[in-house]
């Protein structure tokens, strides 16, 4: 009697089809196309996790620079002054302060320049 590898193969296919949920067209229910689409999506997600960090850092720097210019300095001068004054605040927190609490950000700028 022929034994098919039914359970294992079905489980493998269902795992891929579950990952392809939400895809459009045949990519969501045709195993072969879904497998290719899932593989590509996983590659993109790996790449984009690194890109996300890069893009957020750039966004923080842009926000800090804009707020620093409103307070009469530039980003590079502000970072140098913060380092010289021994104030250790990371860019994410500085950007959040600049956006949410401009008065506190201005106080930090004054402290760094003093």
From Swiss-Prot:
GO terms for molecular function: rRNA binding; structural constituent of ribosome. GO terms for cellular component: ribonucleoprotein complex; ribosome. Disulfide bonds: none annotated. It comes from the Bacteria. It holds the Pfam family Ribosomal_L20. The keyword Ribosomal protein applies. GO terms for biological process: ribosomal large subunit assembly; translation. Keywords: Ribonucleoprotein, Ribosomal protein, RNA-binding, rRNA-binding. Belongs to the bacterial ribosomal protein bL20 family. Binds directly to 23S ribosomal RNA and is necessary for the in vitro assembly process of the 50S ribosomal subunit. It is not involved in the protein synthesizing functions of that subunit. This is Large ribosomal subunit protein bL20. It comes from Anaeromyxobacter sp. (strain K).
